[in-house]
C-alpha cells in the first residue's frame, strides 16, 4: 500500500514538473520571438518614422495608418505582449491590465528614444525629445 501511494505521488509530481517545464518553454519562446520581431527592420523603420509608438496600456499603437505588413507585425507583437503580461499577472497575483500598465510606463520611460512616438496620458501622441516623457501619475 505504501509503495502504491509513493508511486501515485511520484506520477503526480512528474506530471506537475512536466507542466511547469512546458510553461517555461512556452514563455521563453514568446519572449524570444517578441525580441526577434522587435529587431525586425520593418518594425525598427516604422518606429523610427513615427508610424507606431508605445501606448500607455503596454501595447504598441498606430500613430498613422500602417501598411498591411506593419499592421501584421504590430498585431503579432501585441499578442505576444498580452501572453507575457498574462504570465506575469498569474505569477504576481495581479491583473493582466495592471501588468500591461506597469510595463507600458517602463517602456515609455526607458525604451523610447528622442524622435520616437509615445502615447501621453491624455491619449495624444507625443514625440520623445531629450526631456523625460509625459507619463501617467500612477506610473511607478
Question: What are the roles of these predicted feature ranges?
Answer:
Residues 31-37:
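Sec/Tat signal peptide C-region and signal peptidase I cleavage site
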Residues 1-6, 12:
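Short, Lys/Arg-enriched N-terminal segments with co-localized hydrophobic residues
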Residues 38-72, 97-140:
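Amphipathic, charged alpha-helical segments and their helix-to-coil junctions
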Residues 74-92:
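Short, well-ordered alpha-helical segments
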Amino acid at each position: 500500500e505504501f509503495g502504491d501511494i509513493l508511486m501515485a505521488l511520484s506520477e503526480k509530481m512528474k506530471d506537475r514538473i512536466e507542466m511547469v517545464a512546458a510553461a517555461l518553454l512556452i514563455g521563453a519562446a514568446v519572449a524570444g520571438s517578441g525580441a526577434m520581431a522587435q529587431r525586425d527592420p520593418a518594425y525598427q523603420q516604422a518606429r523610427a518614422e513615427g508610424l507606431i509608438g508605445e501606448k500607455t496600456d503596454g501595447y504598441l499603437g498606430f500613430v498613422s495608418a500602417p501598411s498591411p505588413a506593419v499592421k501584421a507585425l504590430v498585431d503579432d507583437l501585441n499578442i505576444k505582449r498580452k501572453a507575457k503580461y498574462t504570465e506575469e499577472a498569474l505569477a504576481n497575483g495581479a491583473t493582466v491590465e495592471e501588468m500591461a500598465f506597469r510595463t507600458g510606463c517602463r517602456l515609455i520611460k526607458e525604451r523610447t528614444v528622442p524622435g520616437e512616438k509615445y502615447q501621453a496620458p491624455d491619449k495624444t501622441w507625443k514625440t520623445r525629445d531629450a526631456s523625460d516623457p509625459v507619463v501617467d501619475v500612477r506610473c511607478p
